[in-house]
Each structure stands twice: as structure tokens, then as C-alpha cells.
Amino acid sequence: MTTYITDKDGKSIDASTVSKIPSDRHFRNAWTLSGTVISEDMATAKTIFKDKIREVRKPLLEAQDVLFMKAMEDGDSTEQSTIASKKKELRDAPATSAITNAKTIAELKAAWDTDLLGASPYA
């Protein structure tokens, strides 16, 4: 039985004939085939990375919304300001320069902000 690998553009190759393949499957949907070499398309990998940030930040933003409402009820404008800043950081997370400037998959993985988003899914 032959196993085929299909890249992001729908090109397929017999897995036994591949000469180089990415070390992990984190960005599997960014794989691109050139001859017998499979590499990762950085533009597609960045999109996947940003989508993962959006997925992770959603519950974090929802939690901040709850805290903000409590601060509003308490009339705590200092806490409201702190929470608003945190929410802005979360909203801006997919647009950081570390992601934009990443030239390699390793640099892209290193762009995960563990202080803001928690443990990296790429560790």
C-alpha cells in the first residue's frame, strides 16, 4: 500500500520518495512540494499561526470582559483601564512585528507570546 502526501496546493507525492520533510506537523497545511522536497510556505504558516492566536485569545478576551463588567459595577476606573489595556494587547497579538518579520518556522514559533497567551502550542 502506497502512502501519498498532499501539499497545500493539492500536489501529491509518494511518501517513500520524499527526500526532505518538515520536522513536525504544526504547519502541515502550509506544506508545499517542490520535486521530492516538502517545505513550509511562510505566508501560509503565518496565517495558520495567527488563526491559532485568535483561537487561544477568544476565551481570554471573554474572561477580561467579565472582569471589566465587574470593575464597572464597582466603579473602579483604574481596574477598567488596566483591563482595557490587556484586551488591546490580546486584540493586537496577531499583528505583532515578530510574526511579520519571521523568516523561518523557528522564528515564527518563537513569536508566541507566552506572557500574554499562555503556553505555546508549538513548544
What kind of feature is each model-predicted range?
Residues M1-A123:
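A preference for well-ordered globular domain cores
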